[in-house]
Amino acid sequence: MAQPGMGLTLNGIAQGYLTDRIVDILRANGCDRVLADMGRSEIRLVGHRPDGQAWRIGLADPLSPAQVAVTLDLADRCISTSGGYGTKFEATGRHHHLFDTTTGTSAGHYIAVSVVAASTMVADALSTSLYVTPPERAGRLLAAFPDAAVLVTRPDGSRHELSEGGKF
């Protein structure tokens, strides 16, 4: 790295990829019901709960993390949430690890982006990509992932589904 203290993280895709690989190993060894949670931001759900119902997942409110903002019932799907609240460079949180692709500064379009997809790697990469992409360019990015469901939380706390189909 160019300066002391600089670092590089592959969390924008690595956790999702590893989650998928771990679940592949579990499935290859006979596990047909799996809830794989890799640190609260990437979750892969295989099959249904033992009672036959879909897995119930609660998404924390990024403005009040002890509160559940949205509850989803999912089976054979994956979810990833990206937000600037994870790794902060200073106490206010204005400067964090997710950079706007057009300005090179910490992205501030949203405070959280959650994506439901068939692959955890796709959900992980897409949630991070959408978080750092200016909103006016999000539609073009989403067009390549028609099966993904996307929920964004804006800085004022309002939530909006970017994807079609009402999966949130």
Model-identified regions with their sequence ranges:
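Mature catalytic core of soluble alpha/beta enzymes
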Residues: 1-168
